[in-house]
Amino acid sequence: MYENKMNLEFVSKSQNEAFARVAVAAFIAQLDPTIDEISDVKTAVSEAVTNSIIHGYENKEDGVIKIEVEICDGEVTIEITDNGKGIEDIPKVMEPLYTSRPDLERSGMGFTVMETFMDGLLVESEKEKGTRVRMKKKFNILS
């Protein structure tokens, strides 16, 4: 059984979204993923971190975003957590094209993208306490 784990913590500045995406991609590179698999994970991480910054912290740059990545037998679990304002109605925000910020010309496709590119998605949130997004992706490991 192969296992590994990484933790990352950064402030909610939009510039850190690219860092988070690349850091997670570099960590999962040990599984020898395809370019498409790396791209899928980077996109999903980008969407989750962007949601934390824009919606959770409402672009305030003093929030903290935590990422935990765990590898276990070819399955990667990525957990992205913020202590932002939380989500009141999770089923509603997970509907395609729903956006709470139409003023920002957001597409409302973040959770749809995460669901499409990953093998599993779980969103947990509590009003005024924050949100946790847990995503899973399976990789074929060559022995």
Curated annotation (Swiss-Prot):
Enzyme Commission number(s) of this protein: 2.7.11.1
Pfam families per UniProt: HATPase_c_2 (PF13581)
Substrates-to-products reaction catalysed: L-seryl-[protein] + ATP = O-phospho-L-seryl-[protein] + ADP + H(+); L-threonyl-[protein] + ATP = O-phospho-L-threonyl-[protein] + ADP + H(+)
Alphabetically ordered keywords of this record: ATP-binding, Kinase, Nucleotide-binding, Serine/threonine-protein kinase, Sporulation, Transferase
GO molecular function: ATP binding; protein serine kinase activity; protein serine/threonine kinase activity; sigma factor antagonist activity
Protein family per UniProt: Belongs to the anti-sigma-factor family.
Free-text function comment from the UniProt entry: Binds to sigma F and blocks its ability to form an RNA polymerase holoenzyme (E-sigma F). Phosphorylates SpoIIAA on a serine residue. This phosphorylation may enable SpoIIAA to act as an anti-anti-sigma factor that counteracts SpoIIAB and thus releases sigma F from inhibition.
HAMAP family attached to this UniProt entry: Anti_sigma_F
NCBIfam families: spIIAB
The protein's name in its UniProt record: Anti-sigma F factor
Organism, as annotated: Clostridium botulinum (strain Eklund 17B / Type B)
Source lineage: Bacteria, Bacillati, Bacillota, Clostridia, Eubacteriales
Gene assigned in the entry: spoIIAB
